[in-house]
Amino acid sequence: MSRMTYFSADEVNEICDRMRSEHYPCDVIHLDTGWFRTDWLCEWKFNEERFPDPKGFIQRLKKNGYRVSLWQLPYVAENAEQIGEAKANDYIAPLTRQQDTDGSNFSALDYAGTIDFTYPKATEWYKGLLKQLLDVGVTCIKTDFGENIHMDAVYKGMKPELLNNLYALLYQKAAYEITKEVTGDGIVWARAAWAGCQRYPLHWGGDSCSSWDGMAGSLKGGLHFGLSGFAFWSHDVPGFHTLPNFMNSIVSDDVYMRWTQFGLFTSHILY
């Protein structure tokens, strides 16, 4: 169960308690972009005011039958806490020129740099960021993005033209390995993919439109994905964004019900 987005432990607990009281089957609660100090500012740390006791918060949810998944991405923002360390140690690939951005948060170009998974020290640094979260009880990391990188940058082990497609594989491998090391279960919640990513399940379609066309596209994409060797795949039910208002239009009951029926036949279902 997810939404865009939960902003506090109290909000999450209220939703989770209500699902149990109404006998709604759910075993994973996913926190998207709002669990940081600032929404979308990925620093791999809980907001201390809105989530004052992360370990206690997660333990309470586990006692209630929920595992916790957290959103993050493989880029470091200019105003992130880790930016100085990341730049000084080349954990993010140095840019050869400044790139234009529209400030949308939806592209690598909206961030100061891409974590360089061709550089073993950067990979271990990234794993350390995730380990701190897994150690307090987080079960799964959402490896969002990864489908594009900064192309005007110098990566330690590969030219960006070669790395661009392979990046998702290296990114998900790192998250999968540290998750399995800490929790014993190898799992991520990934969006991008390339040949070999089936070794690091699972993947979901990501951000489709809440419409009949959006549902049809998710079905067609998922069928092709399965034929490409991916045993596990999922999608947002009933889509992610709406029309004409991107986040605030009402999804029709017919689309909601039919998409739920479709979702039950995929390996994992995400509301």
Regions found by a protein language model. Name each.
Residues 1-271:
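Catalytic-domain carbohydrate-binding cleft regions of carbohydrate-active enzymes
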